[in-house]
Amino acid sequence: MADYSRYTVGVLALQGAVTEHISQIESLGAKAIAVKQVEQLNQLDALVLPGGESTAMRRLMEANGLFERLKTFDKPILGTCAGLILLADEIIGGEQVHLAKMAIKVQRNAFGRQIDSFQTPLTVSGLDKPFPAVFIRAPYITEVGENVEVLAEWQGNVVLAKQGHFFACAFHPELTNDNRIMALLLAQL
């Protein structure tokens, strides 16, 4: 395993499974911090945008002065569920685009309501065995730009993609005991 002990990875701590993301980061040997203030972004080598509700997360980012700084943050980012929506440059249904860091078009709540949540083994490019993907009111990617690499699909829908050092993940890897998706982010450091 690579040595990530000299790196600090932040988890945007406005909504979502912040503690679970921090545990996965620490399980790989990196330092993890909950990010609530814009000044904390300067300490980071990478960032996780967790799940939650994307419109509410944007309002909270704006209220905390984080939104404009996150638009220019150019270090590795993993966006999970609502974090994927924050990274997209187009959102079906007219929702305002947020950080627009990836050339992807997304459909919010594409897998249904909370009651429709599920876990499934998912084949992920670069991983030696299926990943136990947890989908909760998950979005999916309907279109990708030419510089976007599709890493996983579920039933013909893109659910994990990479553009440069940005990762958009429709499912919740932090809700499993499998840290391989987080390791993909840390491998960018």
Curated annotation (Swiss-Prot):
Pathway: Cofactor biosynthesis; pyridoxal 5'-phosphate biosynthesis. Keywords: Glutamine amidotransferase, Hydrolase, Lyase, Pyridoxal phosphate. InterPro entries: Class_I_gatase-like, PdxT/SNO, PdxT/SNO_CS. GO terms for cellular component: cytosol; glutaminase complex. GO terms for biological process: glutamine catabolic process; pyridoxal phosphate biosynthetic process; pyridoxine metabolic process. SUPFAM superfamilies: Class I glutamine amidotransferase-like (SSF52317). L-glutamine binds at G52, E53, S54, R108, I136, R137. Belongs to the glutaminase PdxT/SNO family. Catalyzes the hydrolysis of glutamine to glutamate and ammonia as part of the biosynthesis of pyridoxal 5'-phosphate. The resulting ammonia molecule is channeled to the active site of PdxS. This is Pyridoxal 5'-phosphate synthase subunit PdxT. The gene is pdxT.
